[in-house]
Amino acid sequence: MEAGDKFQQPSRRVNELWQTDFTYFKIIGWGWYYLSTVLDDYSRFIVAWRLCTTMSASDVSDTLDDALAFTELNQVKVRHRPRLLSDNGPCYISGELADYLEENGMSHTRGRPYHPQTQGKIERWHRSMKNQVLLNHYYLPSELEEQLHRFVSYYNHDRYHESIDNLTPADVYYGRGEAILSQRERIKRNTIALRRKNHYDRQRTHNLMS
């Protein structure tokens, strides 16, 4: 399936649509390394990632294996497995990946060539991650991997996203969003009520002293 100018099948719940893509890093003395990521479209939560030495179909399927294991979707029978959204890179159009997706009951949507906006969420993830991770120099793949671990944890659990009501991806992914937003609204109402009371109290005191 190919996506049009604008992705017409937005997700309505977690684990309905997963975006996946590669981005690359160069480690002096080691060469190029490639980060394979699976991002939940609804929550922006990074479900799985791998630092790879190639961009092969097996790297993609290994990352998807990690994602299915993390969500335990490989252990339960569900009506619909996550739909995969990718670009048209060689690894994503390969027969090997098509066979893997069929075996795992997953459908696949590919963006229109030269139209990265279709995968805007994972592209923004790449930018946010590289803005932080590339501030340092890495001399070993393990150093880069350690920094990626830290940033993924921060991104999932501590970084607020304006596009999801200033919640973290983990808040949305684990279903805490509604409760957090309700709590914020209660705090806001109580704060406004307290400010009004303080204002009226000051005004009354001023009038009594006049």
Question: Where are the regions that the model predicts?
Answer:
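Acidic/histidine-rich, metal-coordinating catalytic segments
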Residues: 64, 76-94, 112-114, 165-170
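Mobile-element integrase/transposase regions
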Residues: 1-39, 45, 62-66, 70-73, ...
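Mobile genetic element proteins and their domesticated derivatives, centered on retroelements
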Residues: 21, 38, 44, 64, ...
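A short acidic/small-residue loop/turn micro-motif
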Residues: 40-41, 51-58
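C-terminal domain-tail junction helix/linker
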Residues: 2, 10, 80, 95, ...
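Helix-centered, glycine/charged polyanion-binding patches within enzymatic domains
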Residues: 92-118, 122-126
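Short small-residue beta-strand/loop micro-motif enriched in glycine and branched aliphatics
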Residues: 45-49, 108-111, 135
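Hydrophobic (often cysteine-bearing) scaffold residues that line and stabilize catalytic clefts
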Residues: 35, 56, 60, 85, ...
